[in-house]
Amino acid sequence: EMCIRDSSAADLLTYLYFEEMHIDPENPKMTDRDRFVLSKGHIAPGLYATLAQRGYFPIEDLKTLRHVGSYLQGHPDMKHIPGVDMSSGSLGQGLSAAVGMALSAKLSHEDYRVYVLLGDGEIQEGQIWEAAMFAGARKLDNLVVIVDNNGLQIDGAIEDVCSPYPIDQKFEAFNFDVINISAHNFAEIDAAFKMARQTKGRPTAIIAKSIKGKGVSFMENQASWHGTAPNDEQYARAIEELEKVGEALCQK
């Protein structure tokens, strides 16, 4: 399976798991670990690939994605997948779960941080803003919300379906410190998460402007690829383009 819905957040997931979060793949349930909630659970393959590369489970297991009997199903399952802190897939609920984790840390006087990745179409759900209101009111400065702002959802452009813009001003209204970045610029990603760590007395929202299908020319910014699998020829072409992107990154 290969869907463009995962690629807009690939750089963000890479930074979180390899640079930002305090985690230990050999001890995935350690009590002081940072927590991550993939609220847009339908990009599970991207999360699974990141977890496998980080050492939570064998990379070979990725080939069992959505097979009968596999623990790697279409949405993350905290009961069966090492490194997954919250089951997700029903859009709009992940921020509430993350807020609960962040509040728990405050009440227990623990130092772990909580990160949650939202889709920009997902924030059309009202529950997102109830959770945001609570997080801001409780000054949860151990919470970082990341919005994958690729501008598209399964039915088309988010502006045509139900525009959530201006996203940054909405989070600011709920007492968030807001940072606007490119989701594909590691220098900006790094600076944003460092800034979030320094912010006290309010949660942080990182609005990450991204490109759906990033790295594959014929898939970029095409909502029609949201849940569509490529044929063999398209797959080969996509892999060829992505390998070139990877080689270019390694040379930097």
Where are these regions (language model features)?
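Short, small-residue-biased leader/transition segments that mark boundaries at the very start
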Residues: M2-I4
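Cofactor-binding active-site loop characterized by glycine-rich and histidine/acidic residues
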Residues: S8-A137
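Glycine-rich beta-alpha junction loops
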Residues: D11, H42-I43, L47, N150-G151, ...
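Structured core elements
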Residues: V37, V144, N180, A205-I207
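Hydrophobic alpha-helical scaffolding
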Residues: V37-K40, A157, V161, I179-S182, ...
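Thiamine diphosphate
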Residues: G83, S87-S90, L95-Q198
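Glycine/aspartate-rich loop-and-adjacent alpha/beta segment that forms the canonical ThDP
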Residues: F186-K252
